[in-house]
Amino acid sequence: MKLILTLLVSGLCALAAPAAKRDGVEDYAIGIDKRNSVEDYAIGIDKRNSVEDYAIGIDKRNSVEDYAIGIDKRNSVEDYAIGIDKRNTVEDYAIGIDKRNSVEDYAIGIDKRNTVEDYAIGIDKRNSVEDYAIGIDKRNSVEDYAIGIDKRGGSVEDYAIGIDKRNSVEDYAIGIDKRNSVEDYAIGIDKRGSVEDYAIGIDKKRGTVEDYAIGIDKRGGSVEDYAIGIDKRHGGH
């Protein structure tokens, strides 16, 4: 999990994203929505030396970690956590916890290292092993290398939120929803040679190519370099 996150964070850019000002307050920001204030509703802050050091997504609505969506404090209780929602209890509704031996009930991101779901990138065990799982890597099964499977609809990739088949049309895709067409509401396409090269989230149905894009990395060294999360619903920022 840490390797996947590291790869995503280290090389991704956003198209028409809020500026990552390299030397400014949002330096190394991983997706910022500046609707009302600097960090207001921010969805990704890495300040390297602050309280949220190595944070992968902070929502500072009421307190420092209040409703945080990604904290890695390395030595704290949430060590290795990939997303914490502290609404009522420490792990309450956690969106990614690796406690190695504790109860991961309702967790949407588990690394059990030696269990059946080894290498799983998100498990919800509410009713069965893979029931509504949002991330399975079984290495030798049909969903090999899958980065998110939801089997609710009845078919293998039905409403899948992440498929990597290496040789198919969605080669290297980081999130596919095949409801009506190949890229229909896709949440992450990387075709390596197209306009969306290295894209981490494209929704091509609303009217324009980048409309509602959730992260574009064109590696061209633009101002928004390394941004990972854009919502252009209201014309950008």
UniProtKB/Swiss-Prot annotation:
Phenotype caused by lack of the gene: Impairs the production of ustiloxin B and its intermediate ustiloxin F.
The UniProt keywords, alphabetically, are: Signal
User: Which residues are removed as the propeptide when the protein matures?
Assistant: 20-22, 234-237
Q: Give the signal peptide as a residue range, or say none if absent.
A: 1-19
Pathway, per UniProt? Answer: Mycotoxin biosynthesis
The known PTMs are summarized as: UstA is processed by the subtilisin-like endoprotease kex2 that is outside the ustiloxin B gene cluster, at the C-terminal side of Arg-Lys, after transfer to Golgi apparatus through the endoplasmic reticulum (ER). Cleavage by kex2 generates 16 peptides YAIG-I to YAIG-XVI. To process the precursor peptide further, at least two peptidases are necessary to cleave the N-terminal and C-terminal sides of the Tyr-Ala-Ile-Gly core peptide which serves as backbone for the synthesis of ustiloxin B, through cyclization and modification of the tyrosine.
Per its database record, what is this protein's job? Ribosomally synthesized cyclic peptide ustiloxin B precursor: Part of the gene cluster that mediates the biosynthesis of the secondary metabolite ustiloxin B, an antimitotic tetrapeptide. The ustA translated product contains a 16-fold repeated peptide embedding the tetrapeptide Tyr-Ala-Ile-Gly, that is converted into the cyclic moiety of ustiloxin B.
Q: What is this protein called?
A: Ribosomally synthesized cyclic peptide ustiloxin B precursosr
What is this organism's lineage? Eukaryota, Fungi, Dikarya, Ascomycota, Pezizomycotina
Q: Which gene encodes it?
A: ustA
